[in-house]
């Protein structure tokens, strides 16, 4: 008598990672996935697109949406679009992870919280950067105070940078996944194209190597991404800034800063794509691109 074959039940769900700018959302996503797919920087506003990260472990698949930081300030078109992207990510998910920076609660955190009051999904409060809290006695009163603001599913202190308590956060995520088929193959870590990831890597290096010199009026357009006859990726990246002075900052003395940005970006791409990369970078002034919705659409900031 032949035994009846039974398929193992699988679980899948969508998780939104939200919070004000620069609280460690991208670092958290990268730590969960075990590799970098979302750019990180000490500066705010480094995440401008919703990045989908996919973490599959056995029968569990969690699909993460890493949002731009929510802002009170909406004067510029790009900030309005970033807020729109972050808010829409909250809409149709199974769990929301609300990330805050230690015990530093401010008006932006309050604004995010107010948006979460309307959310249908349960909310986990992840208190990040707890390794930076010098006086640990501050943590318990903060948790007591913040727990009065919303009925959180869980409140969990973490360090995304060091990986502290991330395993327990993942356990909480798994309890929120629904029975159902996996949406992606088990070896997928993102649904973003290599072209998109190349532009994000270049933008991260711009953020890192221009220090506080360059404001957020900079973006990257990939003009060419192809595999040549020798099996090498040929990538041409156009860096757009708003003023001539910013162009000089990016290029640096005798082109050294641009060369450093290019070298670091190429090395990251080769690690991510597991392939040799030939990278060419140019810098161009395009005044007012961050206030022009047509330009933002062509650069991929607005979904068609």
Curated annotation (Swiss-Prot):
It comes from Histophilus somni (strain 2336). This is GTPase Era. Residues 66-69 are annotated as: G3. It comes from the Bacteria. Residues 210-287 form the KH type-2 domain. One of its GO terms (molecular function) is GTP binding. An essential GTPase that binds both GDP and GTP, with rapid nucleotide exchange. Plays a role in 16S rRNA processing and 30S ribosomal subunit biogenesis and possibly also in cell cycle regulation and energy metabolism. GO terms for cellular component: cytosol; plasma membrane. It is a peripheral membrane protein.
């Amino acid at each position: 008598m032949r035994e009846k074959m039974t398929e193992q039940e699988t679980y899948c769900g969508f998780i939104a990672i939200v919070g004000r700018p620069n609280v460690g959302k991208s670092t958290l996503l990268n730590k969960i996935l075990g590799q970098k797919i979302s750019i990180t920087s000490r500066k705010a506003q480094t995440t401008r697109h919703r990045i989908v990260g996919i973490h599959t472990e056995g029968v569990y698949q969690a699909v993460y949406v890493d949002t731009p930081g929510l802002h009170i300030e909406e004067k510029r078109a790009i900030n309005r679009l970033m807020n729109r992207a972050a808010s829409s990510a909250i809409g149709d998910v199974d769990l929301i992870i609300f990330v805050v920076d230690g015990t530093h609660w401010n008006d932006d955190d309050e604004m995010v919280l107010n948006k979460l009051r309307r959310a249908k999904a349960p909310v986990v409060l992840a208190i990040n950067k707890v390794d930076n809290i010098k006086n640990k006695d501050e943590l318990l009163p903060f948790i007591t105070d913040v727990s009065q603001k919303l009925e959180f599913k869980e409140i969990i202190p973490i360090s995304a940078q060091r990986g502290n308590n991330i395993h327990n956060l993942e356990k909480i995520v798994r309890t929120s996944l629904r029975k159902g088929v996996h949406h992606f193959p088990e070896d997928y870590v993102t649904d973003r194209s290599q072209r998109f990831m190349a532009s994000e890597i270049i933008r991260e290096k711009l953020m890192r190597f221009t220090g506080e010199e360059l404001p957020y009026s900079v973006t990257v357009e990939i003009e060419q991404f192809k595999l040549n006859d020798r099996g090498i990726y040929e990538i041409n990246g156009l860096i757009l800034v708003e003023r001539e002075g910013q162009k000089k900052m990016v290029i640096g003395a005798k082109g050294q800063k641009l060369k450093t940005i290019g070298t670091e970006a190429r090395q990251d791409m080769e690690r991510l794509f597991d392939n040799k990369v030939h990278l060419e970078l140019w810098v161009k002034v395009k005044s007012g691109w961050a206030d022009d919705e047509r330009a933002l659409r062509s650069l991929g900031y607005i979904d068609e």
